[in-house]
A protein has these predicted regions:
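Extracellular/periplasmic helix-exit of transmembrane alpha-helices
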Residues: 8-18, 22, 139-155, 163-169, ...
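Extracellular loop-to-transmembrane helix junctions
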Residues: 1-24, 45, 222-229, 265, ...
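Transmembrane-helix boundary/entry motifs in multi-pass membrane transporters
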Residues: 1, 11-58, 250-269, 293-302
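Membrane-interface alpha-helices at helix entry/exit sites of multi-pass transporters
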Residues: 26-27, 36, 40-48, 82-91, ...
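Membrane-interface loop-to-helix entry segments
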Residues: 49, 67-74, 95-157, 292, ...
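Selective recognition of specific alpha-helical transmembrane segments in multi-pass small-molecule
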Residues: 2-10, 101-116, 127-147, 183-184, ...
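Transmembrane helix-loop junctions in multi-pass membrane proteins
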Residues: 57-70, 81-83, 108-120, 140-152, ...
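Transmembrane alpha-helical segments of multi-pass small-molecule transport proteins
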Residues: 46-51, 78-114, 132-133, 266-271, ...
Length: 368
């Protein structure tokens, strides 16, 4: 509920305070509503947001976590036992990781540098079908284990609030569990992070409230539906308690819970993750480029150089450990969210006024 309300507020503000740049493009986001909503004296806070927005794109959920997830999913399908390995940077990797890294980096470069948008458009068309496939797979696992669902939900609740911890450390366990939950929630739906408003600002609407309502539904679908199904499926199959991490946990849940051979389940998850992560990588390039444009006043040379750096980070991602990837992502997510959350608190009166005016106009039948 907090995430949904946060997404509503930030996307409403993004549309209200958006601007038109020199090229005639509509741009906006937290940096705009911080500067124009809170006032010019807060421009320093807008710049801090933009700076860390670039950091999240380059080193966080824009590249490292996505590429690491793709390479892990591909490796789980083609070489789960790491039979074909190569030594790089003092560590041993499966050849599938290296090959998938090269292919992904090449595809991202084609879109960002080569301007070949057909790849991204194909991915965007396929993603809804992949989302439906992922959703149905999760539902199947739940249906096949329907009698165990209440126990699984109880386990999730107990784990979420640290209720299984010893009495002496229960409070500390609860704090840690909630911290992890909030961090993963931000990664999942990006509510409060400040990325969604950058996309919402470009929406073709003159009603800030309407865009806020549309944007907040994404948080509900992603967190309440998709993530809940995934979590329940993982607990039902026992995959959460097998010493696995990252994509391997969900892969094992699909293998154990679906009535298909392990290879089929791994293939389904691999395809879903590849398309989800690829479109996310491209999306975060857009977000972080808007942040860079704000900091550099739209200098084209800076944008072109940035794209090469972004591609380099895509190439590096698969060779990092899962723990390192998530630690970096959590740090930058927090640093990016803080300026945005400060702005949301400061501008809550604007959100309330816009919402009231919109509802009054509906009552008067001035709008549909």
């Amino acid at each position: 509920l907090v995430g949904t309300a946060t997404k509503y507020s930030e996307c409403l503000l993004a549309v209200k305070f958006r601007q038109v740049d020199e090229d005639g493009h509509v741009v906006g986001g937290p940096f705009n509503y911080i500067e124009h909503g809170m006032g010019p004296k807060w421009k320093w806070l807008a710049k801090i947001f933009a700076f860390f927005g670039i950091g999240v794109g380059l080193l966080g959920i824009g590249t490292f976590t996505q590429v690491n997830g793709i390479s892990s999913a591909v490796n789980n399908f083609f070489d789960s036992n790491n039979a074909w390995t190569v030594s790089l940077f003092g560590r041993t990797y499966s050849w599938t990781v290296v090959i998938s890294c090269l292919i992904l980096t090449f595809c991202v470069a084609l879109v960002l540098i080569g301007g070949i948008q057909r790849i991204s458009k194909v991915a965007q068309v396929i993603v809804p079908f992949m989302a439906a496939t992922y959703f149905l797979a999760g539902i199947l696992i739940i249906l096949f284990n329907i009698t165990d669902v209440p126990a699984a939900i109880l386990t999730i609740v107990q784990s979420a609030f640290g209720l299984k911890a010893a009495a002496g450390g229960a409070l500390g366990a609860m704090v840690v569990a909630m911290q992890k939950g909030i961090a993963r929630g931000i990664f999942s739906n990006e509510a409060g992070l400040g990325s969604a408003p950058i996309a919402a600002a470009a929406a073709r609407t003159n009603e800030p409230v309407r865009q806020g309502l549309v944007s907040m539904t994404a948080t509900f679908i992603d967190t309440i539906i998709i993530c809940s199904i995934t979590g329940i499926a993982i607990v039902l199959t026992g995959a959460y308690d097998m010493g696995l991490e990252g994509v391997a946990v969900t892969t094992k849940a699909f293998q154990l819970g679906l009535p298909f051979p392990d290879g089929v389940a791994s293939f389904i998850l691999m395809l879903c993750l590849v398309f989800f992560a690829f479109t996310t990588i491209l999306g975060w390039d857009y977000y972080s480029e808007r942040c860079l444009e704000y900091l550099t006043n739209g200098k084209k040379k800076c944008i072109k150089a940035y794209r090469w750096i972004y591609i380099l980070c895509v190439f590096i991602g698969p060779y990092m450990t899962v723990s390192a990837v998530w630690t970096i992502a959590d740090i930058f997510n927090g640093l990016m969210a803080i300026p945005n959350l400060i702005a949301l608190v400061a501008l809550n009166g604007v959100v309330a006024k816009e919402t009231k005016d919109y509802l009054d106009r509906i009552k008067k039948k001035e709008i549909d």
